From Swiss-Prot:
Pfam families associated with the record: Conotoxin (PF02950)
Name recorded for this polypeptide: Conotoxin AbVIL
Propeptide: 18-40
Biased composition (Basic and acidic residues): 21-37
Family listed: Belongs to the conotoxin O1 superfamily.
Segments for region (Disordered): 17-41
S-S pairs: 43-57, 50-61, 56-68
Protein species of origin: Conus abbreviatus
The keyword Nucleotidyltransferase appears for this protein: no
Domain notes: The presence of a 'disulfide through disulfide knot' structurally defines this protein as a knottin.
GO MF term list: ion channel inhibitor activity; toxin activity
Signal peptide positions on this chain: 1-17
């Protein structure tokens, strides 16, 4: 009886795998690339206005001038 149960469960798994590989899956999971593209933050280039919460491309905002630093800042 145990051998028959194992064979039955194996056959069920193979049938399910074959069905999903043919594209007959009804509810597909969202692609991870879609999620990653929505989560990507844009940075503010050097010389543009910024504050303490701005994501400057070169990592720092000069709070004295309220502008993102450029790549060749002193």
């Amino acid at each position: 009886v145990l051998i028959i149960a194992v064979l039955f469960l194996t056959a069920c798994q193979l049938t399910t795998a074959e069905t999903s590989s043919r594209g007959e899956q009804k509810h597909r999971a969202p692609r991870s690339t879609d999620k990653n593209s929505r989560m990507t933050k844009r940075c503010t280039p050097g010389g543009e206005a910024c504050d303490a919460t701005t994501n400057c491309c070169f990592l720092t905002c000069n709070l004295a001038t309220n502008k993102c630093r450029s790549p060749n800042f002193p």
